[in-house]
A protein has these predicted regions:
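Active-site microenvironment of metallo-dependent hydrolases
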Residues: 1-20, 24-25, 30, 35, ...
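His/Asp/Glu-enriched, well-ordered alpha-helical/loop segment
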Residues: 231-234, 238, 280-365, 381-383
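Metal-coordinating catalytic core of metallo-dependent amide/deamination hydrolases
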Residues: 125-245, 250
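Alpha-helical scaffold segments that flank or form the walls of functional sites
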Residues: 69-135, 156-167, 416-427
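Active-site gating loops and adjacent loop-to-helix segments of metal-dependent hydrolytic enzymes
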Residues: 67-99, 106, 133-144, 211-238, ...
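Helical hairpin unit composed of two closely spaced alpha helices linked by a short loop
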Residues: 271-273
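Divalent metal-coordination and catalytic microenvironments
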Residues: 8, 22, 27, 49, ...
């Protein structure tokens, strides 16, 4: 199907050009016609006054954890995990994860996120929800070598790959998801590595999120988590490492040499008091850094506009440098760099031949005036509620702030139902 998006401000190559048009052919961007005729297209979207941007890419999250939002707040990571989250997760099932995931996808699409990278459990249910929602995703089954389900979890992840890799007209890719060095002993990491190498599956892992994690790893193995994973050969596979808050110069050198990509989660890292990742130093070393929200239970929202703003502001403050992460750089981290983190070279940019993941942002609000610089406004003043229209893989999944793939009334009812089901354990 051919689509014309006309009369828009077009974000390309770090700047916005007004009164532009985009034509789509199926799931790809075809060109940028100067004088298009409406009758030549099957669908015409008039974006007058709006800003066309690449869809935002959430490089690290746990989508079904929307159902833990506000359940456990103001805690440090290990206390939060061990005493609240992990016990509650024992009560998850396919039904709960499906609707928790659908809630996340509604929130993502509403806020302009068109692609995500998830690590969780009951991932077949997550994939089914993502397919119904029409969103793009990289999927990984979270794996814990210390769990009684270590082997069955790995098998689930392999089956997820066999079923979903390349599915959804190319919208889905699958990764293996060893949770972290503190939940995955070396022998298990080697097993995951070997299974991934047999099939060419990339890796998604949490690394060096807290000081305590690094200190314990040094005490047990004499190496940082990143050095340990490198010695175990994990980085011989394409790897996306979430967090990387407490990393040494030697760690950064390893990551640069092995082309490890980083999912930076500023909101979650601040809320859990984990620290601030040395993103400026990593970017200067040539490491690709994307942005993520982490789960809604530790953020507590899936708002990539908020993450762009945070990523720019906290690194200015942390380095005493107003140029540390500019508005344009924050935008690139949330789009094209995020796409690279997920393994794409034809996503996250509005170029001929690129995948048509596009959002139209309403610039009519008070906070969009005066309009000296639309990139600056998007990052520092814009918010997720400004998003008007969302196109993923060439298909319109939200039009004028109305979902086309998700029945929101049914969604709210089902979320209430599965929330009651999930938390029944706390009433016993």
């Amino acid at each position: 199907m051919t689509t014309l998006i006309k009369n828009i401000g077009l974000y390309r190559n770090g700047k916005v050009t007004e009164n532009q048009n985009i034509s789509l052919d199926g799931k790809y961007i075809k060109d940028f016609p100067e004088n298009p005729k409406d009758e030549d297209y099957a669908e015409v979207i008039d974006g007058k006054g709006m800003l066309a941007m690449p869809g935002l890419v959430n490089t690290h999250t746990h989508v079904a954890m929307t159902l833990f939002r506000s359940y456990a707040d103001d805690m440090e990571l290990m206390d939060w995990l061990q005493n609240k989250i992990w016990p509650a997760e024992d009560h998850l099932d396919d039904d709960i994860v499906y609707w928790g995931s659908m809630l996340a996808f509604a929130e993502m699409i509403r806020g302009g996120t068109t692609a995500f990278c998830d690590m969780y459990m009951f991932m077949d249910s997550c994939a089914k929800a993502a397919d119904k929602a029409g969103i793009r995703g990289n999927l990984a089954r979270g794996l814990a070598g210390i769990s009684p389900n270590a082997q069955s979890g790995l098998q689930e992840n392999i089956e997820l790959f066999e079923k979903w890799e390349g599915a959804g007209d190319g919208r889905f890719h699958v990764m293996l998801g060893p949770h972290a060095p503190y939940t995955c002993p070396p022998d298990y990491i080697r097993q995951v590595r070997d299974e991934a190498m047999k099939r060419g599956i990339p890796i998604h892992i949490h690394l060096s999120e807290t000081k305590g994690e690094v200190e314990n790893c040094l005490k047990e193995y004499g190496k940082t988590p990143i050095a340990l994973m490198n010695d175990l050969g994990l980085f011989e596979l394409p790897t996306l490492a979430a967090h990387c808050v407490h990393v040494t110069d030697e760690d950064i050198a390893i990551m640069q040499e092995k082309h490890v990509r980083v999912a930076h989660n500023p909101g979650s890292n601040l809320k859990l008091a984990s620290g601030i990742a040395p993103v400026v130093k990593m970017r200067k070393a040539g490491i690709t850094v994307g942005l993520g929200t982490d789960g809604a239970s530790s953020n507590n929202k899936l708002d990539m506009f908020a993450e762009m703003r945070l990523a720019s502001l906290i690194h200015k403050a942390n380095t005493y440098d107003p140029f540390a992460i500019t508005a344009t750089e924050a935008m690139e981290m949330a789009t094209v760099d995020g796409a690279k983190c997920l393994g794409y070279d034809d996503l996250g940019k509005l170029e001929k031949g690129a995948l048509a993941d596009i959002i139209l942002v309403d610039r009519s609000g008070f906070h969009w005036h005066p309009r000296f610089d639309s990139v600056s406004l998007a990052v520092y003043a814009g918010n997720s509620m400004d998003v008007d229209t969302v196109i993923i893989n060439g298909k319109t999944v939200m039009r004028h702030k109305e979902m086309t793939t998700i029945d929101t009334e049914k969604l709210y009812a089902e979320v209430d139902r599965v929330t009651e089901k999930l938390y029944a354990f706390s009433k016993k």
